Amino acid sequence: MPEEALIGQMATYHEELAQAGVLLDASGLQSSAKGWRIRYAGGKRIVSDGPFAETKELIAGYTIIQVKSREEALAWAKRFPNPAGEAKDAEIEVRQLFELDDFGPSEAVDRFRDLGAGPRT
């Protein structure tokens, strides 16, 4: 669990995202002890219950924003609180989501559109 000070910093940051109208979703992830993995092997799906061996690279949460440019996303990302706590080494990863328009027209894409899937416009 993150310390109270970090939770406060994260709350402030996410409030700023919401006030700017760019926050779509955000949440922390519980320990892998409460999760599972599914491995695909040929036609089989093999379920492994957590906990999993801790790795150096751990996804502990996510924040999804919708902005107009890479530069705007980078500016927000640089303001993200250090997830390990100030003065400690840490790293966050920023990636762009696919939008349905990134795919060519198809019946499958239309089915996702009908679900209302994808970022809000």
Positions of predicted regions on the chain:
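Conserved, structured core segments of small domains
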Residues: 1-121
